[in-house]
Amino acid sequence: FPLGIAFLYFWSLYGGWSIVADGLGADSQQQHHYLYWKVFPVELNEEYLWTLLLYALFVLVIELTLLAVVRSDRPHMDQAAEALWISHTVLLVIAALAAGTSFLIVKDQLATAVLLGKSGYSVTRGGLGEMVPLFTLHQVLNRVALFSLAIGIGVWFTGRQGRWLAGNATLVTGAGYSVLLGGMFLYVTALGNKNELFSALILGGFFHLANTRRVKWGFVGAGAGMMFMGIGLVDFLRAFPLIDLWEGGAWWDAIQWVPEIHASNEAFGAHLSLYGALYFHSPLTYGSSLTALLFSVVPRILWPERPGDIYSHYASSVGIVEGVGEQGFSIHHATGWYLNFGLPGLLFGAVLWGWIWGRCFNAYLCAEATRDRGGRWRYAFAVMAPWGFVAYIPPLIRAGLEGYKGLVI
């Protein structure tokens, strides 16, 4: 819960400190001002005051809902209970197939990026004038591959002694995880997909802590440090042309930049969205996200004019040009609900968020008690639910209510 609340604070309110400080004449040392001419300038006016108040209200309602939903009577956990046995081979095959299919979707765009001297991040996100067909499926497959590796590696290091899930940790499967993880790191570096890598780190790390009977903090710290460095590298290298990554010169610059990752503008893109909606008086859509969510089961390649999500409405209402391929602007989850149903929608969205999060944790607490009644799949879902939800907070907080589709998948 503390990490999840920290995520909410970071993407909701943290960026406000720098904006207010700079607006009052101080120097926050944050390099976010370029967003003002790419999106819109921010003034310390009434709209920005309401932006901060509504974000704070959104986070507070989530916390209060959690307090109301999470069980206070925790069932007894039998430490000697037998864990559910999983197959590392199956997880490796799933990860390999998902990664391979994802690559097939974007291989032509990556080849074009090499020829034109562009970054993979740019060309796969509209830098060539249009989005990649099946881009959403590509993103889902990326997460499937990384999450399968995260779960598998977490279980591999607990071996046969896992509390919830266990498996036969052989050198062959360990080598398979190493090769696939290295390949996926190079792949997401070429794509610039740092958020998927970050979510996988959270899922694998927290599930390992929950699953192991004896925490090796030195190992956990070393693993977290290496992954943090990897995320920093991806964040820096995502803007480089693919040919520069191949030649290798950019990697040393990226390693030197990693300690400066705190200066990333990650906290500002979504934070600005509610201010934009209030300042430009963006009209409410009264449920367009529900329509978009319903019709999203049809791939856009089959229905090019499929109703757009709430970000498209937000972007058009504040004057952001979509598909420019240079900047991954996003919308805050609270803004998505606000643009659908106003203040009641924002409050309902916060309650729904807290209720789902609390139910995920309750399912984990009751996993052992319901194992015989629910079957293997329900048990596996229960023991993974809270860690999976927290791992998905970074992408969910930067999406409208349509983001729940990705959570379910």
Question: Which sequence ranges carry the predicted segments?
Answer:
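N-terminal "leader" segments that precede or initiate the main folded domain
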Residues: F1-L92, A96, G204-L209, R214-A222, ...
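Membrane-embedded catalytic interface detector for glycan/lipid assembly enzymes
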Residues: L35-W37, A68-V220, M226-D244
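Hydrophobic alpha-helical segments
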Residues: E326-I409
